[in-house]
Amino acid sequence: MNKVNKVNYIIEELENLFPKVPVPLNHKDPYTLLIAVLLSAQCTDERVNQITPILFKKADNPYDMIKLSVEEIKEIIKPCGLSPMKSKGIYGLSKIIIEKHNGYVPKTFEHLEELPAVGHKTASVVMSQAFGIPAFPVDTHIHRLMYRWGLSNGSSVVQTEKDAKRLFPEKKWNKLHLQIIYYARKYSPARGWNIDNDIICLLYTSDAADDLRC
């Protein structure tokens, strides 16, 4: 199976397995998605979804958020980890969104990545899932599977993103990155991985073992 056929097979299999892929983080608009994604750094989606209702009950927009102190935000989000850094980031980005963007989350990578505590991955999630702009956020699951499938060399998430964008059609990026995450969690985890449960790798081992790292 050459790389083109492999990519086409992955796309088809993921579409069969996960025709609908909701964003795992609960949110209602670009701002609440931005905050949820920021909180998800080194924290499970499940934990984030437990914390955001508490936070958003007090402040679900930048204007209400800056009425809270950094310390108040920190106490609410403490179960998510990294609360000192995240609370300063949430307060700081809320202030900038008000002062520079009229209270709206900006719609460009440049302006998103200027916000405190917002890196390229967070910006990519917001661009793709809040605004529908093609992006390919790479988290640990996508980084692992791109390497495991022999589609990237695993050298860095930057390289993995470049390879994903080069190999997969742009019109599929926004859905596909979520499908890969869902697949990774269910069939191809980092720990306790069993090839007998890994549908995609199972096909490769009999067909394309030379460029597979399963």
Q: PLM ranges: what are they?
A:
Residues 2-206:
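Catalytic cores of DNA base-excision repair glycosylases
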Residues 204-214:
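Single conserved hydrophobic/aromatic residue that forms the stacking wall/gate
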